[in-house]
Regions:
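Short beta-alpha connecting loops at secondary-structure transitions
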Residues: 61-66, 320-327, 374
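Class I S-adenosyl-L-methionine
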Residues: 1-294
Length: 380
């Protein structure tokens, strides 16, 4: 019954919202059965303006041939923040991402080719002007609606890396106005162009020497110097990959992987029906918090959250802490026992897994002190 489930969840979500730090975020795992009800409930408790995303986790890696109807391969992760405007951390760079960065000019760092321009010329009219091509002498303007990526003094510094440039006023108000999308009478006046200080023969000879030498300036020219202008984006200037709302099993694990992990910890015994893979929680930790974050899992289950926290701390030397809450009778025999074995290490021989280190405390909630407004005689 949906109403019974909501009556169980509502007060818990209200409490969790209060417990969140001001920069905190909550991830709630849910299947299709209660997704719609949970979304409306969370909109009420957290506020629809604090909704961050509905992430689809591909929890299975194979489809049964005898499956009926539309096969359900994903589970949802509803994400809400304590305050509006929360932004996730970037994901670590991958080898595939790094492979796009090359070093054809023997520069200090690998780089990839990027646009030399940026949008919104109308509000950056001082950055709309001509740059004279050092190889051909032709004038290069930003395309319509765009401006040069950096301020003019920075562009001058980069272009001086090819040959000597100077600022010169041109009669090009009509062309600049067209680029900015304004009337010629309204375009900013007095904006100078970056022009070659020497005759084209000397300038192109200087530029050719730089081209052959290597380590070209930040703004370079394609087609062996004869083509258009482009910008280098160095590998160390890109932080990482923004997370998306689809997480494949190859990136964060699947239910079969989670079950195998538990069996390895408990010497082949299947101790839990619906575990989550540690890699799934590790992905959440990567985008949700920093290395000293406090993580609360109020439905701890098999203890995957603690496992993921311990893995992350071992990997990056972080100081994350966890609080697990579990009401079922396996809290001691499975949840806490798993945490202990992960800390100490488990398995034997070639299947041995080194312990993560760390420690934790286990507390058993006793009888309440009060029953209604009266003292509980069982603990008096």
């Amino acid at each position: 019954r949906h109403d019974k489930w909501l009556c169980m969840m509502y007060p818990r979500l209200k409490l969790l919202q209060k417990l969140l730090a001001d920069d905190g975020v909550i991830f709630i795992s849910i299947d299709d059965t209660e997704y719609a009800n949970l979304k409306l409930t969370c909109d009420e408790i957290f506020g629809s303006n604090c909704f961050v995303s509905n992430i689809s986790w591909q929890r299975t890696y194979s489809t049964r041939n005898d499956s009926k109807g539309i096969v359900n391969e994903v589970e949802h992760l509803l994400v809400y923040s304590k305050q509006p405007g929360w932004n996730p951390q970037k994901l670590p760079r991958t080898a595939e991402m790094d492979s796009k960065y090359k070093n054809p000019d023997n520069d200090v760092l690998p780089w990839t080719s990027s646009d030399a321009f940026a949008a919104d010329a109308a509000t950056h009219q001082g950055m709309v002007y001509a740059i004279q091509h050092p190889f051909t002498g032709k004038l290069i303007y930003p395309y319509n609606g765009a401006h040069w990526r950096y301020q003019q003094d920075t562009m001058l510094e980069y272009m001086n890396g090819w040959t000597k440039y100077e600022l010169r006023l041109l009669d090009d108000a009509k062309q600049r106005a067209e680029i900015c999308g304004v009337a010629e009478t309204n375009v900013r006046s007095g904006v100078k162009a970056l022009m070659l200080a020497d005759p084209i023969e000397i300038a192109s000879a200087n530029a050719k020497k730089v081209l052959e030498r290597g380590q070209w300036p930040r703004f370079y020219f394609t087609q062996n110097g004869k083509g258009g202008i482009r910008r280098k984006t160095y590998i160390d200037s890109v932080e990482g990959k923004p997370p998306t709302n689809y997480w494949s099993y190859s990136d964060v694990g699947h239910t079969d992987e989670a079950a195998k992990t538990l069996k390895a910890i408990f010497a082949g015994r299947a101790t839990f029906d619906t575990p989550k893979p540690p890699r799934l929680i590790e992905r959440i930790l990567q985008i949700a918090g920093k290395e000293n974050t406090l993580i609360l899992d109020s439905f701890a289950g098999s203890g995957t959250t603690a496992h993921a926290v311990l893995n992350m701390n071992k990997a990056d030397g972080g100081h994350r802490k966890f609080i697990l809450v579990e009401m079922m009778d396996y809290a001691d025999s499975i949840t806490a026992e798993r945490v202990k074995r992960v800390i100490q290490g488990y398995g034997a021989g070639k299947n041995a897994v080194e312990g993560t280190g760390g420690n934790f405390s286990f507390y058993d909630l006793g009888e309440p002190l009060l029953v209604g407004d009266c003292l509980n005689e069982a603990v008096a």
